[in-house]
Amino acid sequence: MLYRKLAKNMCAACCLCFLHLNTTLAQDRYSLPAADTLRLELRQAEKVFLDSNLQLLAQRYNIQSSQALVEQARKWENPMLNTDQNLYSGGHFFQHSVDANGNPQGEVYAQVTQLIKTAGKRGKQTDLARTNVSLAEWQFRSVMRNLRAQLFKDFYTIAQLQGNADMFGENMQRLLKLKGAQEQELNAGNIARKEYLRVQALIISLQHDMTDNAKSMNDAQSELKTILRITGNVFIKPMVPETESTELPSVTIMQLIDSARQNNTDYQQQVYQLQYNTQNLRLQKALAVPDITLGTEFDQAANYAPNYFGLAISLPLPLWDHNQGNIKSAHYQVKQQEAVRNDAGVKLQNDVLNAYQKLLYTARLSSDDNGRFYSDYYQLQKNIVESYNNRQISLIEFLDFFNDYQAVKQKELEQVLNLRLAKEDVNDIVGIDIIK
């Protein structure tokens, strides 16, 4: 009898060890090694972005390439050398001598010519190249602003998701503590099993919320690490204040619009594209004027006289082709771009107004009164589990308050995120950091 009892206990111990081993292996299978935490303030992240982002590096090379074309546009065409001489005569190759009278024998002809561009074509081509540099610079600023906006969005989103994760973790600890107390009450017969199961269901629901939050966190982390050119198992933890100031600078809509006209990258690209097309029209008109080729030539045995030196001038006669088609095409390109530029100006004004109004709405929602409400609500929540354990509130009241608290906390974190993103939307459209 003693032997059977001992064997039974040993079997149970082995089963427990096996289950523990399987649980450990399962956890190892579905978990990654602990990530290294990189704590960054926003300005630190922005500096890393400016120093290491590969898309910005590619755009910088594009600017340098355009600057090189300005230098090339200034260059004169190389002079042209044209030569002719006799190859074979009287049984001799390259015979260059004089006869008995001292007259040269054999042909030697050489001509050097230089193309002279008229109507200021070289200057107009240089102006086009300079405008192209300005376009490349604004394209660089556009890429930088777009990536910077994505950086800010990911950075602040991670901060919000981290706040959710902290809140979920605190709630899970409270629920697990409550679950442990309920197990004792259930075993003692003091509560119904349905109350215990309701708390378990709440724990499972919270686990799903934590999983969804972690997935969103991974997506934002991946985008942010790509922008910052960070690889490996690194977790970026944004260092941001818990609250966001609702104070806004005293600026008018017209001041914002005027600033946007000077700094908005999309609008400025259309402005410089119009300048480029206008300069191209001037160049096409200049191309209708013929260029002149000047040169000097020497002929050792010319028909006119030995050792002939002459002046050569050549130019095309513009009888039929006056570059009419290209001029007309360039003219309509200017008209087209004027319409595009004007449309971009209308869109810019509406975008500035829309972004600023959204900021005002969001800041109004983040008022001090709401802040006091959140503070009072969270203070009440700290005592809710204890109140339920002491039977001061029912299970239904506890569940309702618990779900409401979680929703309210998420709304507060979302509101802070919305205020930060609304500020950055205004800054992004205006083109400078006018809202701090």
Question: At which residue positions do the language-model features occur?
Answer:
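Bacterial N-terminal signal peptides
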Residues: C11-N22
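Periplasmic alpha-helical coiled-coil/stalk elements that build and connect Gram-negative outer-membrane
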Residues: L2-Y3, K8-N9, L40, V143-S259, ...
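Acidic, low-complexity, intrinsically disordered peripheral segments
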Residues: L2-K8, L25-A35, L413-K436
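Short, charged, amphipathic alpha-helical segments
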Residues: D127-R130, R193-L202, L395-N403
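Bacterial Sec-pathway N-terminal export signals of envelope proteins
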Residues: A26-M80, Q85, G232-Q275, G345, ...
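Amphipathic alpha-helical coiled-coil segments
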Residues: A58-A73, V143, L147-F168, K177, ...
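Small/polar, glycine/serine/threonine/aspartate-rich low-complexity segments that form flexible
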Residues: D28-L38, E71, N82-T118, Q125, ...
